[in-house]
Amino acid sequence: MTENNEKVKNSDSANNQSSKNSKFNFNFEDKKVKCAKTILIIIFLAFLSFQMRAQTADMGFTTNEQYLDVFSDDNGRMYLTALDPYYYLRMSENYLENGHTGDTLKNIDGQQVPWDSYKYGPTGARATFNLLSVVTVWVYQVWHAMDSTVTLMNAAFWVPAILSMFLITPIFFTVRRITSSDIGGAVAAILASLSPSIFVKTVAGFSDTPILEILPLLFIVWFIIEAIHYSKEKNYKSLIYGLLATLMLALYPFMWSAWWYGYYIVIAFLVIYAIYKGISYNSIAKYTKSKNNNHKDKIESEKLEMLNILKISGLFIIGGAVLITALYGVSTTMNALQAPLNYLGLDEVSSQTGWPNVLTTVSELDTASLDEIISSSLGSIHLFAIGLIGIFLSLFRKVLTPVKQISNGLAEKLDIKYALLLIIWFAVTFLAASKGVRFVALMVPPLSIGVGIFVGFIEQFIKNNLDKKYEYVAYPTIAIIVLYALFTIYRADSADLVRMLLPSNYVPIAEGIMLASLAVLIIYKVAELIAESNKKLVMNKIFMILLAIGLITPTIATIVPFYSVPTYNDGWGESLEWINTQTPNNSVVTCWWDNGHIYTWKTDRMVTFDGSSQNTPRAYWVGRAFSTSNESLANGIFRMLASSGDKAYTTDSVLIKKTGSIKNTVDVLNEILPLTKSDAQKALKNSSYKFTDTEVSEILDATHPKVTNPDYLITYNRMTSIASVWSYFGNWDFNLPAGTSRSEREAGSFQGLQTYATNINDTLIVRSLIQQTAEYNIYTLIEVRNETLTGAMMAVTNDGQMQTQQLNMHKVKLMVNENGKSKMYNSLADPDGQLSLLIKVDKNSIIGTDGSNNPVYSSSSWMATANLEDSVYSKLHFFDGEGLDTIKLEKESLDPTANGVQPGFKVFSVDYGNYSK
């Protein structure tokens, strides 16, 4: 036993003796008592995690009952939030109904494989097994057995909150193993569970995989640390924990496709640490042999530890690879070798395929700044810094090593194992976070463990040095931290202090268990403090509790209250239900990819692409169809995608092989898709590429197929807001170098304007605010009199002075609805203008009168970049398909998710016409 360990042992013995000689006969150091306390801590932390996430169910984002009804089911239970949860909800429905995650089985190489017919229509894709769907079905079956009104969506809503309860266990025990501190483990567990980047994507309602991306690695690290801890003992504990880590690794691919990152972190640690222990053992052995020192037992202990570490390393590295290969196939293992290189290319503008890289516009994959990484990890730079300090402090554990200055040939040195693992873990995840804000959550566990180590180190340091004066520095420091925490709460919202203790009462039993376990722990701690005869130790324990409160309170304050508005709603549901009941089963829904998972779930119809297939050539084609003003081209694109998918431009297609490039293939397709089949045939035969008759026939089978699938388009208000994204891809210039920045490429956009429309003396007057400053406002003033449209710009100062000038818009487009009919007015105002004005006035909807009793009409207007003024999307969403011959508005309903037109969720049918003639 080393001197340091003797000191700790003596201190613990003193504490034990103090407890036994206390005012009570109750022994707080009894193993059963400690075990019960640990169980209570775990229960409290687990239900605290659950309760914080239950806040979303309270639907506190509004008090409007009508608005609440739109975002909840018939039983008042909130819909799922975000987008991806609806994919897993559909997979859960398939698993419940079919026993696998596909909606059907497909014969591939003689095997019946679960198949998802709806995603990436009409091709479909293999349906992969996922643990989230299994857990969702389990929760549903248990809950539905008790309450028949429970739906699968209701069960899915609570799955992330339930799974989050398991986050705290590995974090708590990892920190306690390193520091022997319960309070340090509790702080780390709370910070990890409630950190912003993890919390927002694991709240109730966000039934997605982020929780499963983190959870397995936490258990793997905990088991590896336990395996290393027992590596000096002559028992099987070390190998048992190593086996548990390996088995958890084998489950990881079920939960996340990027499982390999955790595998590489642990491999790096085990390899480096095994090498280090080998060098250390040889050094000790050689030194003691040369000095003829009698340290046989210690040398044997070092040897045993080294051999066990080698066994653990082999079991995890080789055994893990074998298990994963056996369970998932060689391709999964081989993909893990290539995956890190693919990850490093996330921010490339153009993918290696030659098509634009959609991932560059996915917000959660935006490159994160250092400030964003720090604020999104633990919530503040202070906790971030404390986490790093804690990782450094994990070095301060002692092990034996030979030094010539010590007479017995052996001395103590820093133990690197915990610091080594945490440093590797932090470094890898920090690199990941720098590549995209989505990955900041991966960095939270090592930082949280670092904070827990910091707390545990402070606790042990003061406890082991009660006879010194360190408390005169430590206690004021802790007091400052507590005061800072209280100031943070006050600055945020002092009215929410009660809600920090009672964040949600939506699940009374969970609230009761959390409060009951907390009450018992408080009683236990108060009794322990009263029983303690060592007053300095009492002060130490009190100040450590205050330190813990001071560290976790600001984080809790930032997430209480917390609300999240669902994306899906009854307005959308009305139109999607129409698709489900009124369209053929082979119909395809085409829209931008973001809502694709919702559409497949609700309509039971194929979609062109969705959140799992956004980074494909279809981003260009769908963007092209919506941004072009050529209706025939848009129609041809919709027909091709809905009926033959990617067949025309796959890597083994005639066009790619014959033209030699994606650019040339795109040029040919843009030329022939607007044409009838006979005209397209002529164009191909006259092409400089000299296509043979067979090749022409194969191309036309893809672009002008004999058998087509009906296509239905969806537009919605948020699609207006993200026009700069889909038009960016739709206007992609393949002639530009692959690395051309986004600012150098063409895109378009829309901006909603405040609009006022009235009728004065038989003149329709529409005023739109286009610029607002502290001194003046600028409006566009559009008038329609005697079927003639005129316009001007008008500046109005704060004191009422007005100045008019010529309208500098490229074009003004105005649609007036009256008596069930629509009339379009078009005016080219300024040929050199870069912006256009799109206006819609509904004379059938009078929303009030002005001071002269003139009617005020429902109206809306948008500023559009000139390249989108006549786009298919503009005609669809703003003007209900007016001006289009082959695309017809079929259904429209409320869209409460974003500002814009109402009804703002629209469904259109596409008539392919006589394309085949």
From Swiss-Prot:
Stretches in topological domain Extracellular:
60-154, 204-209, 261-263, 330-372, 435-438, 491-506, 563-917
Composition bias type Basic and acidic residues, residue spans: 1-10
Site location (Important for catalytic activity): K201
Residues in the Cytoplasmic compartment per record: 1-38, 176-182, 231-237, 287-308, 394-413, 460-469, 528-541
To which pathway does this protein belong? Cell surface structure biogenesis; S-layer biogenesis; Protein modification; protein glycosylation
Region of interest: Disordered: 1-20
Motif DXD motif 2 covers: 208-210
What is the enzyme's class at the highest EC level? transferase
Q: Which Pfam families match?
A: STT3, STT3-PglB_core
Catalytically driven reaction(s): an archaeal dolichyl phosphooligosaccharide + [protein]-L-asparagine = an archaeal dolichyl phosphate + a glycoprotein with the oligosaccharide chain attached by N-beta-D-glycosyl linkage to a protein L-asparagine
Signal sequence annotation: none
Can you list the GO cellular component terms from the UniProt entry?
Answer: plasma membrane
Which cofactor does this sequence's record say it needs?
Mn(2+); Mg(2+)
Please give, as recorded in its UniProt entry, the membrane topology of this protein.
Multi-pass membrane protein
The short sequence motif called DXD motif 1 sits at 82-84
Subcellular localization, as worded in the UniProt entry = Cell membrane
What residues bind Mn(2+), as annotated? D84, D208, E364
Which family does the UniProt entry place this protein in? Belongs to the STT3 family.
Q: What is known of its domains?
A: Despite low primary sequence conservation between eukaryotic catalytic subunits and bacterial and archaeal single subunit OSTs (ssOST), structural comparison revealed several common motifs at spatially equivalent positions, like the DXD motif 1 on the external loop 1 and the DXD motif 2 on the external loop 2 involved in binding of the metal ion cofactor and the carboxamide group of the acceptor asparagine, the conserved Glu residue of the TIXE/SVSE motif on the external loop 5 involved in catalysis, as well as the WWDYG and the DK/MI motifs in the globular domain that define the binding pocket for the +2 Ser/Thr of the acceptor sequon.
The name this protein goes by in its record: Dolichyl-phosphooligosaccharide-protein glycotransferase
The species this protein was found in: Methanococcus voltae
